[in-house]
């Protein structure tokens, strides 16, 4: 065979262990395993190419106890370790070596580790099992239950046993180790001069080669040339009887599937009453294929996917609906293996978004079909998570621009970038940096496989929030600490290798450290929030008993105005679902409106403050911390940390790319550069979250605590500096603050930047305060929730109101509530009086009572989650205080006392009545013969029926059914009016610190509605003689 020069854009890397036979003599042979690496990519012409790589190895790192002299005992230790190696070809001295590395955790000097290399993943797992004495990290009980062999820990010289050795790098993917060894990107152009073309090539890709993995290198000449990627989008149409378990019902059916390819070709596969499967030409770019049975339709889709040979497959909500329906129907029709075969190398497999391909999959857990050579993407998941700021969400745009850049930056294969989120990206990035700096990658320091509960987590205070000053504020400027958490890491040298507890032993001197000290008070009597909350409780609830037991509901006419937060005697069991049709809540509001005695303004303001403080105490999750915390941080002059180095590279590269993008040039190139800088920003901001995640892959709570404490210090000092200059600070939150500007400023932009520069001069480099926005008018509703009108740089004022958080961005409110809320907000920003605001509310309610509001404006939507099979219960892990709290699918219910003896049909009816009203409506619709709603959201109206009870389930109805039966069903106008109280009261509380404005506005309407209901009852109730 002749050697060829090969250049490909690699986007998918796959590793597997292959069994092989080893011939020792002519009459003796044995079996062993070796790793094969398959790389999928496209060449310069866009043709799909697969490269089979050999000579692949994987390795792990062994850490011995600090008090064990591994250097003295090395020869005997190596002998024992080699005896534990499974594959005979791996039992060589070069595969078991002693290396000197700096530990990742703690301020420590270099120490000796042992690096063990393997030619197969199977051999690596077997070695771990023999050394540690566990079955792949499982317990002895698990091994017995599964019929596995129990291995005792190995014994080493001088009393060392295998369970005392920490083994790192077990979960580092082999493909990542190969990429780092060769220093090539997981998604980009690579080349080799020693490729051999395979004699036999599968029809699923154009070219196939073999090559030694060590001959590949990064191709710099193709760095700026975008690849030609052929992609496809797909969608299914199906009849579903139960949206909670799509595709599982015997009468469910997929009747149509559509495919759109990036080259302009479209395909439509459908069921139809034809005698043969003829191909119908719709137009020159669309093919329609008709099938007689659902099974043939699914097989036709699988065959089409293999024939197209695309590099990526995209869908909308495909991981929660399309994939689940497709696999459920294929499983019922006994063609699951053929349907899974959608890639360039069979077979495909079902995988979750966490990368798990084994074990039971939850009813509501996103899944995808993992196929070699074809990246599976769900654009809806992109929209909901990482890519919410992208200007468009087409597959071609995301895969070619953003995902590629994120994969290159974080050293992560393309499919992991999308499916396994930031934890995996930071993990891969840290592994890459540790390898470069000869630092031991200690990913097994805290047994990250263990699930950390709330009781295991050591609490610490979160970010600082300065409560907003009530009212509409004119001429406000916002200052923001640019990339605060990443720059804090750099400024204070915060890292795994530098931050330690104050009392920890270290080989460094005390003068080599900087001490970070702060007070942490969470849920204790020293916390100002708790102190103020308890004082307000005594004022608002004077009848509380000495033992602090909760008081019962106050009678009508007494107590505070807003009783949304008062305890209920009949508290609902369902805790994980926002039920927008809660009749108890409506009754609470109605009682508040109709009470004869309203509290004073002082009581209202005390109540507003009480609600805010109660929400913050609830956010503490019952944690109690009362102590002075101290940490020591190694100075950067002594030893720079690895995290500051990583973050600094990301920020410097982002700044460089932004400077290049600011120069006028090709729009396509500018779009590419913009997504590159966005990828750097997201990655830098993710590092703080990775250190603080309790169940994370590389946790370091000391680093997270230090970052948060220093962040509070920075924003407090910045607020104080502005106040010392006589500039009022209206609101502050985490990394930003809003200051009051003078009306006579000629250039507010220059003034605000000058203020930011002055505050910056007191901060450590590279921290910087920048001016973010100049605001004409702003109303703060709470944390991360405000409404504003921005000031333009030409001196004008934006006509559009910007909503951040709150009702305007929520889907579960009706259009009537949203539009009324918006009209009230616009009236407030127009500086109308309090009485005029009441008039706006009254007029909108009057329109509703006169039936001048369109039905579509009254429609509400709520998400319907899974209820499983309707009767099987599981213990609720989140609500351990309630013994009678059980999980029915994704909902929490009370278990029937005779659950084990009653029939399944009775239990289904019993538990269905406990579920939210919109869930009951969804099942009612399916009983009427209507298909379930794709996407899991049901639309409904609030209605009232003659003689119906006040149960919420009987008082909501689907729109079409309402229109067909409007003569006997009426709109429940009072419900929609009462739904205005909460959101608009929140706005009025922020402006006037009063809670009775909406109540006063709707009180005549509520009284009128009550009279109408009484008249209808008297007129239409039959007389019994």
UniProtKB/Swiss-Prot annotation:
Keyword Transcription regulation: no
Keywords linked to the UniProt accession: DNA replication, DNA-binding, DNA-directed DNA polymerase, Nucleotidyltransferase, Transferase, Viral DNA replication
Pfam family, one: DNA_pol_B_exo1
Catalytic activity: DNA(n) + a 2'-deoxyribonucleoside 5'-triphosphate = DNA(n+1) + diphosphate
UniProt-listed InterPro entries: DNA-dir_DNA_pol_B (IPR006172), DNA-dir_DNA_pol_B_CS (IPR017964), DNA-dir_DNA_pol_B_exonuc (IPR006133), DNA-dir_DNA_pol_B_multi_dom (IPR006134), DNA/RNA_pol_sf (IPR043502), DNA_pol_B_thumb (IPR042087), DNA_pol_palm_dom_sf (IPR023211), DNA_pol_type-B (IPR050240)
Record EC number: 2.7.7.7
A biological-process GO annotation: DNA replication
GO molecular function (one): DNA-directed DNA polymerase activity
Known function: Replicates the viral genome. Host DNA polymerases cannot substitute for the viral enzyme in this process.
Family: Belongs to the DNA polymerase type-B family.
Protein's recorded name: DNA polymerase
Organism: Trichoplusia ni ascovirus 2c (TnAV-2c)
């Amino acid at each position: 065979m002749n050697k060829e020069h090969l250049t490909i854009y690699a986007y998918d890397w796959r590793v597997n262990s292959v069994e092989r036979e080893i011939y020792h003599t002519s009459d003796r042979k044995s079996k062993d395993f070796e790793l094969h690496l398959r790389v999928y990519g496209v060449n310069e012409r866009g043709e799909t190419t697969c490269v089979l790589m050999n000579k692949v190895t994987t390795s792990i790192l062994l850490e011995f106890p600090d008090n064990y002299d591994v250097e003295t005992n090395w020869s005997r230790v190596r002998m024992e370790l080699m005896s534990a190696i499974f594959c005979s070809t791996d039992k060589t001295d070069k595969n078991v070596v002693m290396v000197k590395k700096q530990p990742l955790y703690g301020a420590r000097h270099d120490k000796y580790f042992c690096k063990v290399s393997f030619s197969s993943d199977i051999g690596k797992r077997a070695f771990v099992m023999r050394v540690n004495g566990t079955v792949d990290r499982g317990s002895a009980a698990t091994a017995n239950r599964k019929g596995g062999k129990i291995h005792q820990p190995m014994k080493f010289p001088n009393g060392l046993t295998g369970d005392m050795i920490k083994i790192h790098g077990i979960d580092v993917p082999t493909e990542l180790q190969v990429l780092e060894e060769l220093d090539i990107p997981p998604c980009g152009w690579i080349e080799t001069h020693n490729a051999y073309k395979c004699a036999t090539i599968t029809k699923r890709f154009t070219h196939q080669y073999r090559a030694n993995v060590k001959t590949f290198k990064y191709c710099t000449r193709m760095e700026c040339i975008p690849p030609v990627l052929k992609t496809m989008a797909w969608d299914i149409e199906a009849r579903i009887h139960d949206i909670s378990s799509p595709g599982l019902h015997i009468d469910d059916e997929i009747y149509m599937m559509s495919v759109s390819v990036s080259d302009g070709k479209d395909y439509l596969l459908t069921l139809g009453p034809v005698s043969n499967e003829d191909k119908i030409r719709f137009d020159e770019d669309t093919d329609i294929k008709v099938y007689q049975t659902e099974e043939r339709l699914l097989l036709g889709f699988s065959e089409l996917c293999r024939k197209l040979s695309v590099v990526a497959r995209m869908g909308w909500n495909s991981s929660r609906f399309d994939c689940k329906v497709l696999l459920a129907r294929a499983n019922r029709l006994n063609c699951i293996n053929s349907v899974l075969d959608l890639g360039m190398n069979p077979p495909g497999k079902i995988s979750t978004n966490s990368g798990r391909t084994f074990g039971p999959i939850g009813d509501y857990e996103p899944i995808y079909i993992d196929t070699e050579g074809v990246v599976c993407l769900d654009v809806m998941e992109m929209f909901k998570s990482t890519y919410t700021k992208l200007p468009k969400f087409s597959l071609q745009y995301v895969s070619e621009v953003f995902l590629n850049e994120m994969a290159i930056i974080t050293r992560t294969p393309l499919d992991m970038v999308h499916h396994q989120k930031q934890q995996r990206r930071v993990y891969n990035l840290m592994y890459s940096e540790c390898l470069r700096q000869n630092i031991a990658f200690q990913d097994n320091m805290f047994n990250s496989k263990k699930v950390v509960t709330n009781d295991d987590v050591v609490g610490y205070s979160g970010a600082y929030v300065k409560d907003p000053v009530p009212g509409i504020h004119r001429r406000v400027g916002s200052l923001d600490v640019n990339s605060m958490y990443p720059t804090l890491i750099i400024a204070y040298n915060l890292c795994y290798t530098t931050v330690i507890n104050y009392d920890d032993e270290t080989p460094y001197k005390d003068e080599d450290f900087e001490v970070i000290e702060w007070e942490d008070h969470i849920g204790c009597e020293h916390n100002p929030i708790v102190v103020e909350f308890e004082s307000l409780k005594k004022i608002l609830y004077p009848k509380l008993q000495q033992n602090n037991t909760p008081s019962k509901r106050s009678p009508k006419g007494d107590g505070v105005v807003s009783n949304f937060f008062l305890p209920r005697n009949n508290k609902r069991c369902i805790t994980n679902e926002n039920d927008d049709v809660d009749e108890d809540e409506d009754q609470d509001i109605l009682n508040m409106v109709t009470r004869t005695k309203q509290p004073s303004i002082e009581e209202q303001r005390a109540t507003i403050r009480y609600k805010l403080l109660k929400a913050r105490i609830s956010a503490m999750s019952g944690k109690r911390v009362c102590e002075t915390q101290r940490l020591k941080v190694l100075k950067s002059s002594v030893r720079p940390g690895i995290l500051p180095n990583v973050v600094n590279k990301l920020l410097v590269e982002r700044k460089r790319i932004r400077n290049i993008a600011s120069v006028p040039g090709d729009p396509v190139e500018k779009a590419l550069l913009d997504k590159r800088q966005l990828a750097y920003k997201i990655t830098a901001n993710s590092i703080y979250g990775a250190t603080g995640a309790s169940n994370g892959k590389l946790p370091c709570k000391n680093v997270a605590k230090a970052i948060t404490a220093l962040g509070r210090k920075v924003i407090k000092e910045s607020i104080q500096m502005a106040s010392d200059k006589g500039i009022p600070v209206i609101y502050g939150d985490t990394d930003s603050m809003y200051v009051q500007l003078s009306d006579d400023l000629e250039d507010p932009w220059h003034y605000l930047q000058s203020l930011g520069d002055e505050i910056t001069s007191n901060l450590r480099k590279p921290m910087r305060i920048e001016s973010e926005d100049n605001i004409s008018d702003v109303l703060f509703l709470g944390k991360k929730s405000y409404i504003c009108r921005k000031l333009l740089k030409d001196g004008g004022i934006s006509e559009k109101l910007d909503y951040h958080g709150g009702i305007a961005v929520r889907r579960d409110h009706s259009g009537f509530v949203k539009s009324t809320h918006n009209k009230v907000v616009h009236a407030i920003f127009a500086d109308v009086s309090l009485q005029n605001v009441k008039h706006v509310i009254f007029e909108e309610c009057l329109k509703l009572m006169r039936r001048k509001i369109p039905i579509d404006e009254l429609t509400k939507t709520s998400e319907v989650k899974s209820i499983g099979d309707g009767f099987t219960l599981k213990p609720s892990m989140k609500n351990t205080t309630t013994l009678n709290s059980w999980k029915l699918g994704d909902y929490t219910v009370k278990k029937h006392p005779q659950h084990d003896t009653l029939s399944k049909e009775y239990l289904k009816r019993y538990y269905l009545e406990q579920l939210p009203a919109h869930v009951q409506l969804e099942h009612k619709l399916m009983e009427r013969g209507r298909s379930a709603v794709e996407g899991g959201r049901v639309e409904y109206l609030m209605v009232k029926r003659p003689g119906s009870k006040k149960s919420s389930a009987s008082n909501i109805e689907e729109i079409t059914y309402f229109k067909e039966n409007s003569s006997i069903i009426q709109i429940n106008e009072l419900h929609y009016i009462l739904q205005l109280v909460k959101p608009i009261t929140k706005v009025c509380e922020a402006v006037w610190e009063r809670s009775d404005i909406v109540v006063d506005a709707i009180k005549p309407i509520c009284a009128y509605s009550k009279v109408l209901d009484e008249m209808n009852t008297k007129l239409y109730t039959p007389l019994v003689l």
